[in-house]
Amino acid sequence: MESEPLYKLKAEFFKTLAHPARIRILELLVERDRSVGELLSSDVGLESSNLSQQLGVLRRAGVVAARRDGNAMIYSIAAPDIAELLAVARKVLARVLSDRVAVLEDLRAGGSAT
């Protein structure tokens, strides 16, 4: 059986992350482990059923882990690398946005913005 090329696996991984709610969930879980109730009250912007669906996607991808604590399910990031990935994404985005602001400012000033 032929295995999937690594680039396809990477693309699937990034597709898992390609949803604003999932990114927000991960940002909250990087701070600390949380129950579904805590996530709902943390301005995730999702209804309970949609939150459960998004957590399921993240669990199946191995990005978050869950454990039972009494009646509550407690979610956490599955590996510290997830926190690093989010931090790198933030740095890249800040640089990209900074470059765009510089071009916009140049255009407003009447420059040639090359």
UniProtKB/Swiss-Prot annotation:
Stored Pfam families: HTH_5
Boundaries of each HTH arsR-type domain copy?
2-97
> Where the record puts its DNA-binding region(s)?
37-60
Entry GO CC: plasma membrane
Q: What induces it?
A: A member of the dormancy regulon. Induced in response to reduced oxygen tension (hypoxia), low levels of nitric oxide (NO) and carbon monoxide (CO). It is hoped that this regulon will give insight into the latent, or dormant phase of infection.
Specify the species. Mycobacterium tuberculosis (strain ATCC 25618 / H37Rv)
Practical use: This protein serves as an immunogenic antigen, inducing gamma-interferon responses in whole-blood cultures from M.tuberculosis-exposed adults in Uganda, The Gambia and South Africa, indicating this might be a good vaccine candidate.
Q: Which SMART domains match?
A: HTH_ARSR (SM00418)
Which keywords are on file for this protein?
DNA-binding, Transcription, Transcription regulation
Q: Which GO terms describe its molecular function?
A: DNA binding; DNA-binding transcription factor activity
Q: Do you know which SUPFAM superfamilies this protein is assigned to?
A: Winged helix' DNA-binding domain (SSF46785)
* Annotated protein name in UniProt: Uncharacterized HTH-type transcriptional regulator Rv0081
Entry's CDD domains? HTH_ARSR
